[in-house]
């Protein structure tokens, strides 16, 4: 089963992102406010997408990326200024202000790609 994990440092942002995804037909497996919580959540899951901000209280997104398995893809949502400071090309970046359809389309495409990849293996 493919999963979605949402990780942002503020609970209200996590819940907004979760609600956008749920309203568009996705199941959200976990919501987290720290990188450590996200790592614990991902360890229980097989594959999917991590939707996150660029920085958490305990780490930044690329530290989280190093801790998640290759069966997960990452979508980072951040301002252009944050991306200039911390970003790299190893993940998918969506700029703020975020359009809901950009998030939905990106997550949908990634889940489709992961599903195909897992079927081949």
Predicted feature residues:
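Alpha4 helix (beta4-alpha4-beta5 surface) of REC/receiver domains from two-component response regulators
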Residues: 63, 78-96, 105
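Two-component/phosphorelay signaling modules centered on CheY-like receiver
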Residues: 11-30
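Conserved acidic carboxylate
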Residues: 8
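Acidic, metal-coordinating helix/loop segments flanking the phosphotransfer/catalytic sites
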Residues: 31-49
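C-terminal output helix
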Residues: 98-111, 115, 119
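Short, structured coil segments at secondary-structure junctions
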Residues: 25, 70-71, 87-89
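Conserved phosphotransfer microenvironments
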Residues: 35, 48-69, 79-82
């Amino acid at each position: 089963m493919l999963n979605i994990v949402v990780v942002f440092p503020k609970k209200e942002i996590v819940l907004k992102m979760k609600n956008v995804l749920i309203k568009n037909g996705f199941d959200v497996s976990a919501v987290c406010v720290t990188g450590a919580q996200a790592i614990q959540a991902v360890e229980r899951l097989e594959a999917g997408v991590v939707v996150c901000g660029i920085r958490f209280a305990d780490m930044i997104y690329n530290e989280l990326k190093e801790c998640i398995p290759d069966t997960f893809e990452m979508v980072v949502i951040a301002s252009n200024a944050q991306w200039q400071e911390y970003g790299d090309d190893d993940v998918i970046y969506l700029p703020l202000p975020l359009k809901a359809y950009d998030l939905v389309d990106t997550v949908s495409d990634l889940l489709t790609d992961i599903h195909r990849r897992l079927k081949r293996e």
